């Protein structure tokens, strides 16, 4: 009997770990199921936006809806909290539109990696302990996707080139 209970406990722990891992990654989300405040913010901010990809995940205790979309020929992204607060807005830009100081920071991290898609990001709110907190002033950041030796990563730097988020190099999926 103790052996069966031990296995049951082990199975419960395993299932709990699977649940934790599953909930820490974003998952595709159907646009028709968006909470009304999120849908309203997106439609108001981007009336000509066409959603290409929509994911949802909990970040720092806040449900975030991550939109990848286009408006005309411009590729954009935005993160909107479940209460309808636009946390961040992103515009895909050419590499040469990144200011010199920011590009210097990107190149220092790249260390010979091939730089791909680049982004201009404006963050208006921080997420902390389940709360959406307005920043004193929006923060401008730049991101660059990179590849090297069969791996891909993304670096995010502040306008002055200081690394805000270092890349996590992961194998390129085929």
PLM-predicted stretches and their roles:
Residues 1-13:
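Bacterial N-terminal signal peptides that target proteins for export
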Residues 11-21:
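Bacterial N-terminal signal peptides
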Residues 22-26:
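Sec/Tat signal peptide C-region and signal peptidase I cleavage site
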Residues 27-45:
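Short N-terminal segments immediately surrounding and downstream of signal-peptide cleavage
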Residues 45-50, 110-113:
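Sec/Tat-exported extracytoplasmic proteins
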Residues 50-78, 127-156, 162-163, 171-173:
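Exposed beta-strand-loop-beta-strand "reactive/processing" segments of non-cytosolic proteins
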Residues 82-120:
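Long, charged/polar, surface-exposed segments that mediate recognition or autoinhibition
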Residues 90, 167-168:
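Beta-propeller fold detector
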């Amino acid at each position: 009997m103790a052996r069966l209970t031990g296995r049951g406990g082990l199975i419960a722990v395993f299932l709990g770990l699977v649940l934790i891992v599953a909930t820490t990654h974003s998952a595709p989300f159907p646009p028709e199921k968006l909470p009304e405040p999120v849908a309203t913010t997106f439609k108001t901010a981007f009336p000509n936006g066409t959603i290409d990809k929509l994911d949802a995940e909990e970040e720092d205790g806040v449900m975030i809806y991550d939109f990848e979309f286009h408006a005309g020929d411009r590729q954009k992204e935005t993160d909107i909290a479940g209460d309808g607060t636009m946390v961040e807005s992103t515009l895909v830009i050419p590499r040469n539109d990144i200011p010199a100081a920011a590009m210097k920071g990107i190149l220092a991290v790249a260390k010979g990696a091939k730089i791909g898609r680049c982004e201009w990001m404006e963050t208006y709110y921080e997420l902390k302990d389940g709360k959406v907190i307005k920043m004193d002033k929006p923060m401008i950041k730049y991101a660059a996707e990179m590849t090297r030796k069969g791996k891909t990563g993304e670096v995010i730097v502040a306008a002055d080139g200081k690394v805000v988020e270092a890349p996590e190099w992961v194998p390129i999926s085929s």
